[in-house]
């Protein structure tokens, strides 16, 4: 095993261990915390990188998480909601807006959003979501104990297990394609883990990178006829362009295994799904604890999802002529 392999395994294991330790409650079985009797009125800035189902769900979940802790919009919390439309200059303007307005806390949805606001302020608490690895993104010193003004939830998905799912559905697959945004560090991390897992199974990975949504179809077409299936990570550009991607893949009858459930529902075939709404709820609860003075971001471990349930899009399976094995369907959520 080379140094890079060891480093990747340690990194993935470290993130997943943080999830196991930091999120005993993302599954929803825990007791609800009592809402504070009188929460002081606060202003919260919400910056979302781009509009797509997963990030929208994380946004909605955050508001619910805050509400569960006593913060109700229009009563004791005001949200300044901003969408950067995947534009870096927009992100910088939004970050400066929040700093100038002296918001009490910033909720940053997706890595570029969190990185931009973290560069703009080291004083205002920042809670993130839809971020795969905070340490790799240089947002924290350590995922278990951030040591900065940033904390939140991670959307790290079980990449190696996603490959296992792909091979159960397409058992004869020898070459797997992947499409991701070259500038997204979280996507690159997932692809590195995918390549390590594939090497152990003698699976060849063919990559196609994009820089914006306009590159998606060309990237997909470059893989047609060269791969047996696709794996797409939790990548914001790809997620926002799933309908565009599936125009190509459905025509070629190419199955897509996705990094999260909203992408699978939007035209992918299957996933071991990340639930962004629940992650948003947990982020909201963490934010409320910070605002109430119960915790500080520098001491709050990054939290994430522990259990991943298979989701199968039978509508897509029927369209592309893929038979889903009974062992995969058993216990899975089925979209018809």
Where are these regions (language model features)?
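Extracytoplasmic "Venus flytrap"
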Residues: 41-69, 80-89, 183-187, 237-240, ...
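C-terminal motif of bacterial Sec signal peptides marking the signal peptidase cleavage site
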Residues: 22-25
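Hydrophobic alpha-helical segments within soluble ligand-binding/sensing domains
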Residues: 134-173, 275-295
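An alpha-beta-alpha
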Residues: 44, 62, 151-198, 300-316
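Hinge/cleft segment of the Venus flytrap/periplasmic-binding protein
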Residues: 13, 289-336
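Bacterial N-terminal signal peptides that target proteins for export
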Residues: 2-13
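Bacterial signal peptide processing site
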Residues: 27-30
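Beta-alpha junction/loop-to-helix N-cap segments that form part of ligand/metal-binding clefts
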Residues: 84-141, 232-259
């Amino acid at each position: 095993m080379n140094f890079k392999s060891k480093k990747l395994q340690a990194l993935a294991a470290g993130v997943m261990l943080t999830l196991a330790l930091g999120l005993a409650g993302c599954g929803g079985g825990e007791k609800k915390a009592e809402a504070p009797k009188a929460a002081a009125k606060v202003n919260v800035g919400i910056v979302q990188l781009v509009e797509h189902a997963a990030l929208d769900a994380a946004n909605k979940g955050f508001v619910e998480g805050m509400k569960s802790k006593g913060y109700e919009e229009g009563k004791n919390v005001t949200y300044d909601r901003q969408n950067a439309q995947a534009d870096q200059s927009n992100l910088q303007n939004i970050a400066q807006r929040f700093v100038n307005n002296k918001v009490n806390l910033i909720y940053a949805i997706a890595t570029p959003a969190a990185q931009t606001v973290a560069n703009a302020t080291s004083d205002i608490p920042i809670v993130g979501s839809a971020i795969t690895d905070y340490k790799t993104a240089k947002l924290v010193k350590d995922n278990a104990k951030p040591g900065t003004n940033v904390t939140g939830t991670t959307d790290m998905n079980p990449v190696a297990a996603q490959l296992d799912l792909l091979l159960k559905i397409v058992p004869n697959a020898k070459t797997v394609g992947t499409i991701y945004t070259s500038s997204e560090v979280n996507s690159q991390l997932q692809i590195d883990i995918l390549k390590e897992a594939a090497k152990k199974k003698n699976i060849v990975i063919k990559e196609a990178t994009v820089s914006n949504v306009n590159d998606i179809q060309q990237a997909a077409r470059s893989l047609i006829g060269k791969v047996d299936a696709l794996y797409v990570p939790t990548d914001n550009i790809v997620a926002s362009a799933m309908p565009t991607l599936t125009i190509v893949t459905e025509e070629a009858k190419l199955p897509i295994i996705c990094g999260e459930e909203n992408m699978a529902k939007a035209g992918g075939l299957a996933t071991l799904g990340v639930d962004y709404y629940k992650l948003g709820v947990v982020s909201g609860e963490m934010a409320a604890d910070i605002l109430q003075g119960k915790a500080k971001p520098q001491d709050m471990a990054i939290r994430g999802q522990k259990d991943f349930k298979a989701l199968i899009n039978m509508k897509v399976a029927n369209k592309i002529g893929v038979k889903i094995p009974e062992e995969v369907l058993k216990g899975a959520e089925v979209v018809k």
